[in-house]
Design a protein with these regions (language model features):
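Active-site loop/oxyanion-hole signature of alpha/beta-hydrolase fold enzymes
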Residues: 4-43, 84
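An amphipathic alpha-helix signature
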Residues: 5, 26, 108-118, 131-135
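Hydrophobic/aromatic beta-strand patches that form the interior of the parallel beta-sheet core
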Residues: 6, 67, 178-180
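Conserved hydrolase catalytic core segment
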Residues: 38-82
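A catalytic-pocket lid/entrance helix-loop region that shapes and gates access to the active site
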Residues: 69-106
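Helix-loop "lid/cap" segments that line or gate small-molecule binding pockets
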Residues: 99-103, 112-124, 137-139, 155-158
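Conserved serine/cysteine hydrolase catalytic core
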Residues: 129, 136-188
Length: 188
């Protein structure tokens, strides 16, 4: 599995001073695809799904198909609002970006992180097994504690740059697509 820049095992590649938007994610995934001998299926959630769309559009010879869980695809009006927010330098005030910036970074243990997330916010509907898997993989050892693998500042900055329009990429797709969406109440 590939970790997007600043997420999971690729945290060392995250540089806030050079981050200008999701294009870096698209380029990273395309660079990975170019190292592979055979085309592959791509699967992703949220930003990962949108990144997969853009990589498949730009390198159709490397992608057999897509499995997309809640890709970030906004209607034009919502996209315009986000673009204006960025233009006015107010992106960090978006609810997702602001919430990510406030995320607690360090816990005494995986068990403490699990207890903190259980029944709260976006996690309140998650089965225990899913929540446990999330906590086991979203946190890395830091001394005698655990910390988020994706720094709150990086996640917040990524959310603050949610203005990308994937529609041109969607129109270029030439592979099978399986798209999954929440039945009710998604992120936006």
């Amino acid at each position: 599995a590939w970790d997007m820049r600043g997420h999971g095992a690729s945290v060392g590649a995250a540089n806030l001073s050079t981050f200008r938007g999701w294009e870096i994610y698209y380029r990273d995934l395309i660079a990975l695809l170019e190292c592979l001998d055979e085309p592959v299926w791509l699967a992703g959630h949220s930003i990962g799904a949108t990144t997969s769309i853009m990589a498949a559009a730009r390198r159709p010879d490397k992608v057999l198909g897509l499995i997309l869980a809640e890709p970030v695809i906004m209607d034009p009006m919502q996209g315009l609002k986000l673009w204006l927010t960025k233009l006015l330098r107010q992106s960090q005030r978006l609810s997702l970006a602001a919430g990510a910036a406030r995320r607690r970074r360090v816990f005494q243990s995986h068990a403490a992180a699990l207890e903190n997330y259980r029944g709260r916010g976006g996690f309140k509907t998650w089965p225990e097994a899913w929540l446990n898997a999330y906590v086991q993989h979203a946190f890395v050892p830091q001394g005698d504690q655990v910390q988020l693998a994706c720094a709150p500042e990086w996640e917040s900055t990524t959310f603050a740059h949610t203005e990308h329009n994937p529609w041109p990429g969607i129109r270029q797709l030439r592979c099978p697509v399986i798209a999954l969406a929440a039945e009710r109440g998604s992120t936006f």
